Structures are given as structure tokens and as C-alpha cells.
Amino acid sequence: PRLDYGKQMLVYENLDAPTGPSLVRYILGHIEQSYMSHALTIHASRFYTAIYPQKYRQMVLENKPVFNTTPVDYSPHKPLRIAYLGNIRYIDILKNLADAVRGDERFKLSYHGGGPDYEDLKDYVNGVPNIFMTGPYKYEEIEHLYGSADIIWAAYPNKDFNVRYAISNKFHESLAYAIPAVYADKTRLGEYVVASSLGCQVNPYSVEDIRSLLIELYSNRERLLQIHESLKRQYREENS
């Protein structure tokens, strides 16, 4: 749809939902709605439409990377290979993941990427024989990194209002390469992947919950293979 006001058109690109304390969200929400009443709003997540009045003109245009690939060959390994790719931040959650597998020979955990908390995390896992930090990578390497993993860690802090409704690039990458990923519970994305057999969800603040899920996936190879097949099928449907 196109909105023309004389010779002007206002397009509001909504990349993130307002977040912060409730008063801040209230103020930002009113500012947003003043824009939306005179604009076409383009949402970067399919889940944002649920938090905005339907009377406004809206469309979804997710920030999907362009993939020239086919799903990688997939066969879960022992030890189970878990990978995090991206900016090293949300350090408490990344430490929880490390604690969930620390010293457990059933798992191999790799953190790929740099960022503000890189040195902190590096010190935290220093000397742990089954945890590795590889540092920054180029995006051209991402297919190889996905192909070297059995599970992708994509659980962000669900206490953040935006995270509850956002859809991450990790979802689109997981779909393209057909590698199962773990997302935060109490989020629309987490609910969606579980309902569609496209991934798993977990409480990212609980080491015990993370450990329990990973042990279940280690013991239940068929669940991972089922998710892999669902991801391939979904990707074909979206790109046919």
C-alpha cells in the first residue's frame, strides 16, 4: 500500500519494539502511534503486529539475509556440538550456557564472535576442556560454522520487552541451514518454533533448565532429526 499526502509519503520502519521501564515504553508508544496514524508502518518482525492497533496500515518485511545455499548435511554427533554465533553480550546468559555443559564430555560448546564481553567470557571458561572461543568471524564463514554445529544457541534475555516479540537473524539462518536452534521461552519466537517443530525453547536464566534440555536432546537424537526435517520443509515452502 502507498500513502500519499500531497507529494509526501511517510514510511515508519519499525526495527525494534519500544523497550525499557514501563513509563518509557508508554511515552515511546504514544510517539510511535502519532507516526503510525500518518504513515505506512513496516515491521521487522511478524510478531510486532500483535502489539500495535490494527486500525493503522502495517506490513511485515523481515530483515532476512540473502542465502545462496542448501541445507547442510546433518547428523547429530557425540559429543553434541553446541554453537553460539554473534556478538558476545548478555554475558549472564552466555555464562549460564557454559555452566550447563562445563566439564561434561557429552557436549562440546563453541562461542564464535567478538564483542564487549569477550574477555570476560574468555576468562570465565578458561581451562574448561569442552568449551572453546574462536573469536570474530567473517559472515562468509557462517555456512561452515552452522555446518559444524548440531545445535545453535539463540536464546536472548526474555525479560526485555523487545526480545519477547522480535525475530532474530538466527531464526532465518537456522531455517536456511536446517540446523536446530534453542530460543528463549516466554517469547513469541520460542512459542512459534515449538508449535511448528522448528526448534526448542528454554529458560535462559536457569542453568538447570538449560542442562536438562541439552541432556534430553543428547539422548533423543530423533527429536533433533525431526526438527531438521521440519526446517528443510519450511524453508522449501518459503522459497518455492
Task: Tell where the protein language model's regions lie, with residue ranges.
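Membrane-proximal helix-turn-helix segments that form the acceptor-binding/catalytic region
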Residues: 4-8, 12-41
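A charged, aromatic-enriched C-terminal amphipathic alpha-helix characteristic of glycosyltransferases
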Residues: 205-208, 219-240
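Short beta-strand->alpha-helix junction loop in the catalytic core
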Residues: 17-19, 47-48, 60-71, 88-89, ...
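Nucleotide-sugar-dependent
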Residues: 92, 140-145, 152-172, 176, ...
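Nucleotide-activated donor-binding/catalytic signature segment of Leloir-type glycosyltransferases, i.e.
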Residues: 119-148
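Conserved donor-binding/catalytic core segment of Leloir-type glycosyltransferases
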Residues: 42, 65, 73-92, 97-101, ...
